C-alpha cells in the first residue's frame, strides 16, 4: 500500500452534492458541498425528484472542483468511494453512477460506503477514534446507539421505534410555522424560551436503549391545537424550549447510561442533529460529570458531506473491500451491514 492513500469520495444520498479528497483517512484535501436547501425550502422538505435533478446538474463540476482544490489529478487517486445507502434511491444513483464511471475510466478500485458509517467517521477527521466507544447517531432518518469495539465494527444496542429525532424536529417546526429546515430553527428559538410546557419524556422499558418520539410529537401538536382552539397565545420560543429539553434529556441520559453499562469512557455523536447546541451543551455537562470523553464533529462535518465518506472508505480500502461495477444503491441499509469482520 502507498505511503499516502488518496481517496476521492462522493456523497449524494439526499440533498447535498458533495465530493472530497481524503488523505490517509483523516486529512481533508478538499471537501466541496453543493447545498439544495433553497430549492427545497418552498416545499417544506426534500423532494426526491428535485434532489436528483440537482445532483445531475452539479456532480461533474463538483468532482472537478474537488480535484482542483486538492491540487491533484485522477491519476493520483488510489480509490473511488461512494455512498451506497441508505438514502433517496434516485439521488444515490447519481453519485454511484459517477463513481462507477470514474472507477472504470481510470481503472481504480470502487469502495461502497454506508452513509451512517460516514457520519460516525466524521469524528475521525478531527480526533482519532479510540476503542471501545459508544456512538449516538442523531439525524433526520436515524436515531441509534451503537457500540464499537474496533474500527468498522458496529453493534446496534438501541434505536428509534418510530420517528427519528430529526424527523420529529421538522414536524414540530412545521406545526409552529418555522421555515425549512426546522431543526436549526427550533434550536435557535430554544435559546430564548422557557420550559413552560410539560411535554413527555419517553423512557420505554427499564434499561432499554431504544427511543420513541412519536408520542412527544403528538403531544406538542395536540397542545398547540388546544391553545389555538381557545385563542390562547402560542409562544414559539417556549414550545421550542420545552420540546428540545424533552428530546435532549432522553438522548443524553440514554447515551450516558449506555456508556456505563458497556464500561466505556468514550462517547461520540454523529449525524445532522449533532450540530444542535442544546444537545451538545447537555452532553458536555453529563460527560464531564461522569468522566467520559466526548467527541462531536464541527457543525460543518455533522451535515452530509463527502469527507466523512472518504474517512470511512479508508478502512474498507485497507481491508481490501471493493465493489464490482454493477454496484447498486440501497434506500434502506442497517449499519451493522457495514461491519468489517476481522
Curated annotation (Swiss-Prot):
It is found in: Cytoplasm. The keyword Acyltransferase applies. One of its GO terms (cellular component) is cytoplasm. The keyword Iron applies. Signal peptide: none annotated. InterPro entries: ATPase_NBD, Gcp-like_dom, KAE1/TsaD, Peptidase_M22_CS, TsaD. Keywords: Acyltransferase, Cytoplasm, Iron, Metal-binding, Transferase, tRNA processing. Its cofactor is Fe(2+). One of its GO terms (biological process) is tRNA threonylcarbamoyladenosine modification. Fe cation binds at residues 115, 119, 304. Coiled coil: none annotated. Substrate binds at residues 137-141, 170, 183, 187, 276. Binds 1 Fe(2+) ion per subunit. It catalyses: L-threonylcarbamoyladenylate + adenosine(37) in tRNA = N(6)-L-threonylcarbamoyladenosine(37) in tRNA + AMP + H(+). Its EC number is 2.3.1.234. One of its GO terms (molecular function) is iron ion binding. It comes from the Bacteria. Required for the formation of a threonylcarbamoyl group on adenosine at position 37 (t(6)A37) in tRNAs that read codons beginning with adenine. Is involved in the transfer of the threonylcarbamoyl moiety of threonylcarbamoyl-AMP (TC-AMP) to the N6 group of A37, together with TsaE and TsaB. TsaD likely plays a direct catalytic role in this reaction. Belongs to the KAE1 / TsaD family. This is tRNA N6-adenosine threonylcarbamoyltransferase. It comes from Staphylococcus haemolyticus (strain JCSC1435).
Amino acid at each position: 500500500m502507498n505511503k499516502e492513500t488518496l481517496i476521492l469520495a462522493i456523497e449524494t444520498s439526499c440533498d447535498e452534492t458533495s465530493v472530497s479528497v481524503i488523505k490517509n483517512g483523516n486529512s481533508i484535501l478538499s471537501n466541496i458541498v453543493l447545498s439544495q436547501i433553497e430549492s427545497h425550502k418552498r416545499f417544506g422538505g426534500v423532494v426526491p425528484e428535485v434532489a436528483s435533478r440537482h445532483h445531475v446538474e452539479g456532480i461533474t463540476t463538483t468532482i472537478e472542483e474537488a480535484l482542483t482544490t486538492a491540487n491533484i489529478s485522477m491519476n493520483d487517486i488510489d480509490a473511488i468511494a461512494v455512498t451506497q445507502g441508505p438514502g433517496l434511491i434516485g439521488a444515490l444513483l447519481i453519485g454511484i453512477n459517477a463513481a462507477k464511471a470514474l472507477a472504470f475510466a481510470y481503472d481504480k478500485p470502487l469502495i461502497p460506503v454506508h452513509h451512517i458509517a460516514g457520519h460516525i467517521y466524521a469524528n475521525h477527521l478531527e480526533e482519532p477514534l479510540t476503542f471501545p466507544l459508544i456512538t449516538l447517531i442523531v439525524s433526520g432518518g436515524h436515531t441509534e446507539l451503537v457500540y464499537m469495539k474496533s474500527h468498522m465494527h458496529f453493534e446496534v444496542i438501541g434505536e428509534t421505534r418510530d420517528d427519528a429525532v430529526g424527523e420529529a424536529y421538522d414536524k414540530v417546526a412545521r406545526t409552529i410555522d418555522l421555515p425549512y429546515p426546522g431543526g436549526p430553527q427550533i434550536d435557535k428559538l430554544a435559546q430564548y424560551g422557557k420550559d413552560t410546557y410539560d411535554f413527555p419524556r419517553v423512557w420505554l422499558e427499564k434499561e432499554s436503549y431504544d427511543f420513541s418520539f412519536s408520542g412527544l410529537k403528538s403531544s406538542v401538536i395536540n397542545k398547540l391545537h388546544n391553545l389555538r382552539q381557545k385563542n390562547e397565545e402560542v409562544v414559539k420560543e417556549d414550545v421550542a424550549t420545552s420540546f428540545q429539553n424533552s428530546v435532549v434529556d432522553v438522548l443524553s441520559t440514554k447515551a450516558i447510561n449506555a456508556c456505563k453499562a458497556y464500561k466505556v469512557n468514550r462517547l461520540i455523536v454523529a449525524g445532522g442533529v449533532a450540530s444542535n447546541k442544546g444537545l451538545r451543551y447537555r452532553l458536555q455537562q453529563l460527560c464531564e460529570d461522569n468522566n467520559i470523553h466526548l467527541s462531536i464533529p464541527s457543525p460543518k462535518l455533522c451535515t452530509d458531506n463527502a469527507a466523512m465518506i472518504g474517512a470511512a472508505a479508508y478502512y474498507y480500502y485497507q481491508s481490501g473491500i471493493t465493489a464490482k461495477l454493477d454496484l447498486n444503491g440501497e434506500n434502506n441499509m442497517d449499519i451493522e451491514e457495514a461491519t468489517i469482520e476481522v
